[in-house]
């Protein structure tokens, strides 16, 4: 493990599995310290976090398209943040990235599931958690590929369609 700046921060973790709607007793906050990065890792200061309906499903111990969040693990979600230190060949300090990290002030990442925000970005960064992120891509491909809508077709979207349906 290489020497890096020491960072103390807060993270939200899954304390217990919810039964019904999630409550504040299911999630707790703890202090975490990072004092080194391995080769291939980067440290991200998270600036935006998603709060998507899928997170509640990940809190359950049910198989899904994503594995359940383990007890005592950080709550997984999409984030947007700035790389503050990197030992990864594809990312440099100052890069703005979005991807799957967690509800924490900082994330240590191996770069998997991370995408750089273009340097010439002119859009608010939170767009990368909605229209430009997984939610937006799901909505786009749902309409263009799965639904195969054509000119003149009518689309009715339920208010219960969630984040994807809102796009």
Could you describe each region identified by the protein language model?
Residues 33-51, 59-103:
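Glycine-rich beta-strand-centered segment in the early N-terminal region that forms part
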Residues 77-82, 93-159:
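NAD(P)H dinucleotide-binding glycine-rich loop of Rossmann-like/cofactor-binding domains
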Residues 165-166:
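N-terminal Rossmann-fold NAD(P) dinucleotide-binding loop
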Residues 1-4:
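Short, Lys/Arg-enriched N-terminal segments with co-localized hydrophobic residues
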Residues 21-33:
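Short glycine/threonine/proline-enriched tight-turn/helix- or strand-capping micro-motif at secondary-structure
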Residues 7-12:
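Short structural boundary motif marking the start of a folded domain
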Residues 15-20, 49-51:
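Short polar catalytic/cofactor-binding loops
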């Amino acid at each position: 493990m290489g020497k890096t700046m020491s960072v103390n921060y807060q993270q939200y973790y899954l304390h217990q599995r919810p039964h019904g709607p999630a409550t504040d007793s299911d999630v707790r906050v703890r202090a975490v310290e990072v004092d080194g990065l391995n080769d291939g890792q980067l440290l991200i200061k998270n600036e935006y976090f998603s709060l998507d309906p899928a997170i509640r499903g990940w809190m359950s111990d049910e198989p899904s398209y994503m594995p359940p969040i383990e007890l005592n693990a950080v709550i997984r979600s999409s984030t947007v943040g700035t790389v503050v230190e990197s030992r990864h060949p594809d990312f440099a300090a100052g890069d703005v990235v979005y991807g799957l990290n967690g509800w924490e002030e900082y994330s240590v990442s191996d770069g998997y599931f991370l995408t750089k925000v273009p340097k010439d970005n002119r859009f608010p960064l939170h767009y990368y958690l909605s229209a430009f992120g997984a939610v937006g891509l799901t909505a786009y491909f749902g309409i263009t590929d799965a639904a195969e809508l054509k000119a003149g077709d009518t689309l009715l979207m339920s208010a219960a369609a969630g984040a994807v349906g809102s796009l």
